[in-house]
Amino acid sequence: MAPAVSLAVLALVALLAPGLGVALPGCDYPAHLWCSSWEIAVACQVESHCANLLRPAAPPVELTLFYESLCPACRWFLVQQLFTTWLLLPAEALSITLVPYGNAEERNVSGKWQFQCQHGPEECLGNMIETCLMHEAKNFSSYFPVIFCLESGSSVTKNLEACLQVYAPQLDSGRIAACVQGDTGAALMHHNAQLTQALDPPHQYVPWVVINGKHTDELQEQAQASLLGLICRLYQGEKPEACGASGAPKAPFHCRH
């Protein structure tokens, strides 16, 4: 028995090729296959009539934030823009990578990496805590609320236990501390240094925002003015409901070298 053809497709055949049953120009498929896949529907220009097909999922917008834990501008952007945007958008619309290092410098002393940070040793410790937290938690949705808690609180370096209790009680603070104090943390921070040093163009300040592998002054300004609006414009899939919201005020400064 021949495959069933939808009434919509039959109507299209009647309208577009009356009496012939031939395909549209550029479409090499018979009418009964026009709604068999999204690719064929697009080729035959009938996708709006193939209600049974789902549009292929658009890739998420890829955002990488290069920052440092005690930079006021970084904290503002992470708390006021990035975290709120992440809460509002579904995972399929936005994928985030965090790289805490920023304007730090590193040197290898007798085979061990040492770090000097723009806002002093406390910032190096904060960078290391957040890096080890990410390493131990693995899952972004587990560690990002903890980082938000640290960055929005009174002390990035002293509130880990409290933030874990609220946002990720399943994580072991002892393992995070061991990472911070051991070779693993230094190796992870060295990797962050390599990622930061490999930026093209080189970063001039933090927060430094890379969108889909690209950084421009225009993207940076748009991200700091309204990150939600920027992601909504760039996302090629069906727009989430939150994309009707307005943006937050623009961050007034950076932390430069």
Which role fits each region the language model picked out?
Residues 45-61:
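A short beta-strand-turn-helix
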Residues 2-7, 66, 153-257:
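C-terminal cap of thioredoxin/glutaredoxin-like
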Residues 29, 37, 46, 52, ...:
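Disulfide-rich extracellular modules and peptides
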Residues 2-5, 12-37:
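N-terminal signal peptide
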